[in-house]
């Protein structure tokens, strides 16, 4: 209709109630009883009156849907009067540069901005009522901000619904000056032909996204939700957010579209549940955090605190009580771990304690109770041990004098935990802090004898239960030897026992490792185990048994020598593929006194009768059988490196038999 008309002026008039038949070009939807023209004495001119329901009573321009207006000016002005307590709405059909037609629904019924790719709902609750108003709508701003990427091209349709009084409709090329406008931006005035009389109270109100946001901030009770309004409101502290927040973008017609989606009950419920889940997860994360966690400890400040386990974790994160640790004064010597005094005798319980006692006798205890599947509590224990490692700035050297029996060297010993059904009790582990491997066995033997009675009882109850790490230590101190047996036995070579221990102790704590080490940086290549065959393991087992028997005969106070302890020091493979493979932790020393490969050499020549008597039963007359049986019962046979050697009692019996 206006496409071929000149629109380069200040305004273009679309509708006026003056004249003989002002609604001739308009499509009127409603009976004459609700839509009519009358003379208004207040404004001293004719006006169009629309009453009744805004859904049914309205006027539309152009009449035919195939026609278009083709209005290209930026601002659309409705000169209207809206009564109190009545709804009013208008609908605008716009076309963007992509020739896509979109609709803007402006109504007092809407309480928030919502949009789809082709439609948008804009609230009009801020409109001035019971006064004549020049309602100026910024078409360019609404198009570009609501429909992302769209650029306004033309206004092609207008629908005005009840309830209102309508005097004029026109477009403006420039922004009009508002009644309460204090901006310094350039603004135009309403054209003289479109102005109301000076004695008629009226206001000019500009409507765009910025005004909608400002109105929301002012009133607070009417939320506006769009991409810009969310950013605008979040930048101001005084704004009030509603729980029904809209998404910045949504899916429409199979593609992702920027802008808020239309409100719906199902979408709000889903969004509310998502926010609830996020808030619950945030509270749980806060409850599981440790408030006094310190990862960097100054070497000068030796009065650092152990990490206290948070009470919130005991209340929310775990069902077991948590006992916080106490700070260590700076005057105390370097603390070392010490076993708790009361190991639990309950096999089904998985409560574990970590005791800390320095050489002066002061004791600090940190307990944490958790189930075997509670990985978070295990991480807390590992973190406490990590900080304990950081506190020990200097390791104990070999030159340190041997402590008296009254105060044995401190070691990690864990009380009983849930074991296999065969009745295995809790496991214990000892970490000797002496650098000399030769004195390690002496220290362990003496301290095991002079330790507390409760500890001795716990050791006797479980002579075969061994504490094994489920993962290889990442920061193993150099020069330290591990005594895996409570009775001083340096190694375990029974594959069956290995599998039993591995299955039973998988619920124990993970390896305590830390980011810092008291010595030089750990090189894993130095501790890479070498593969050993089954025959070599059997040879080591026979060597250990032979050495134990020899030392029992000679009255030695301990097991093997230090070099043999290092050679027999084995660890269980932690690979998930093979849990029964034994690996040697350290290579065999060069200066070892006795080596199993040397023992495999053929023995020195001996009496062939001794070998015949041992490999096959001798032919003995029946009269001498009782004597031979009594003598054979007192003989002992030992195996060393696959070769069979005869002891002195058996040689004597063979001599008598011959």
Curated annotation (Swiss-Prot):
Q: Could you tell me which species this protein originates from?
A: Rattus norvegicus (Rat)
| Compositional bias ranges of the Basic and acidic residues kind | 339-349, 494-506
Traced from the root, the source organism's taxonomic lineage reads: Eukaryota, Metazoa, Chordata, Craniata, Vertebrata
According to the UniProt entry, which residue ranges have a biased composition of type Polar residues? Answer: 319-328, 625-634
Positions with biased composition (Acidic residues): 507-521
Q: Where is this region: Disordered?
A: 312-522, 589-634
Pfam families given in the database record? CFA20_dom (PF05018)
Gene name on record?
Answer: Cfap20dc
**What's the protein here called?**
Protein CFAP20DC
Q: Where is the composition biased (Low complexity)?
A: 351-363, 417-434
TM segments?
A: none
